[in-house]
Regions:
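Short, solvent-exposed loop/turn segments at the edges of extracellular beta-sandwich modules
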Residues: 5-12
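Primarily a LysM-type cell-wall glycan-binding module
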Residues: 15-44, 61
Length: 326
């Protein structure tokens, strides 16, 4: 807080104190409602004090938090070292410029990358699948499925201090769009177009005609294919995903555990997928709608060392070098 005392002619008046406040420096993928929730203040109070026109955070911006009820530093837990690693290159995830061989190993980087499907149903425009991806070189990232994993709809938009816009993709990679005139440029070789809307951003995938729509918080709200079939996402008041609705209107309901990780997904037919975590925060096992259990084992750095199928057979055994390469 700030104190001030008026003085005139050698005489001092009453000393007054300002409201207590703190200054928070934004990260590229922070969410304003969660910052407000952490410090125990109303989101509208922050927006009014800062005269903010939208809620999309920008790396390096400083936010004035008036009368915080909690003064411990906020950390979104998003990206950290993982974020820095991806910004250095686009070789995490199954990108266009990556060569894979043997198991799902990126031969450019030695990164172990794996995609698995938990459930599939028939729907308009083709099968609708619940998928998740694992990146060993992204094991420092703790997301909605523990360390190293991303969910199919874990997509976000964020901004850097220089005005670049980041697209955090569902395969664990990041695409950086750089400002160019009144628009943005995608990296060379990437067939994407980014446009700004009244409500946020839209990314168009030129090779298949699909589009990904993001709101003013940078959260994914809808995916639409070239035929206009839309998958829509809904969030709770704290901006955690609560449901996914397919083009035909079928709903997948999301449940979270006490640490806001995916606990279960209930399918339209009432069956479900459950997710269990070990004490270190790793995704330890997944139980599919048929009752089959897949197990995962990790080292102390959250890198997957083995996984076992529904029959208990070990499918993969990984060893890593000092650089985290398989």
């Amino acid at each position: 807080y700030v104190t001030a005392t008026a003085s005139f002619g050698g005489k001092s008046g009453k000393t007054v104190e300002s409201d207590r406040f703190l200054i928070y420096e934004e990260g590229a993928f922070d969410l304003m409602p969660r910052i407000a929730q952490h410090y125990g203040v109303e989101l509208n109070t922050i927006l009014a004090d800062m005269r903010m026109q939208d809620c999309l955070t920008r790396q390096g911006n400083r936010i004035f938090i008036r009368e915080p009820k909690n003064t411990t530093a906020y950390s979104s837990g998003v990206l950290s070292e993982y974020y820095k690693a991806i910004i250095d290159g686009l070789l995490l995830g199954r990108a266009e410029n990556c060569e894979f061989g043997y198991e799902p190993v990126n031969l450019n980087t030695g990164n172990f990358y794996m995609e698995q499907t938990d459930a599939t149903i028939a729907d308009i425009g083709g099968d609708f699948a619940l998928t998740r991806q694992y990146n060993a070189k992204g094991a420092a990232y703790e997301g909605s499925l523990g360390f190293g994993w991303t969910f199919a709809y874990d997509e976000r938009m964020g901004e850097l201090a220089d005005g670049s816009v980041l697209w955090l993709r569902n395969n664990g990679g990041i695409i950086t769009f750089t400002p160019a005139g009144e628009g943005y440029l995608a990296p060379a070789g990437c067939d994407y177009e980014l446009s700004e809307t009244e409500n946020g951003y839209v990314v168009e995938i030129l090779d298949d005609g699909s589009r990904h729509e993001f709101d003013s918080f940078g959260l994914l709200r809808a995916v639409e294919d070239s035929c206009g079939n839309r998958t829509e996402l809904a969030y709770d008041v704290d901006l955690y995903l609560k449901s996914i609705t397919t083009p035909s209107g079928k709903e997948f309901r999301i449940a979270l555990d006490e640490k806001n990780r995916l606990s279960s997904i209930t399918l339209p037919d009432g069956h479900g997928v459950t997710y269990t975590y070990d004490e270190a925060g790793n995704l330890a096992q997944v139980t599919n709608p048929a009752g089959g259990v897949v197990r995962y084992v990790y080292d102390d750095s959250h890198r997957m060392t083995a996984w076992y199928d529904e029959n208990g057979h070990r499918v993969v055994a990984n060893e890593y070098d000092g650089e985290g390469r398989v």
